[in-house]
């Protein structure tokens, strides 16, 4: 219910299922045109899946910064 409420208010909402930090809240609600950076981390030869490409595009369209970081 809260996700739908926030989306109706214009937020891009992400429900976190598993994180690297204990105690992180369940939802991330990002206002349009925010300065959030979403980084998809890959190995130098790692492939970005269609779903990952879709999500990155969705976030870009919402005004967020995105990147594909290739570590090595």
Q: Predicted segment positions?
A:
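Catalytic phosphate/metal-binding cores of nucleic-acid and nucleotide-processing enzymes, i.e., regions
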Residues: 1-72
């Amino acid at each position: 219910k809260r996700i739908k409420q926030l989306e109706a208010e214009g937020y891009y909402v992400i429900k976190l299922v598993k994180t690297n930090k204990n105690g992180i809240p369940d939802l991330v609600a990002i206002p349009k045109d925010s300065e959030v950076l979403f980084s998809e981390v890959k190995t130098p030869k790692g492939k970005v899946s269609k779903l990952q490409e879709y999500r990155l595009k969705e976030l870009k369209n919402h005004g967020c910064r995105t990147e594909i970081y290739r570590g090595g």
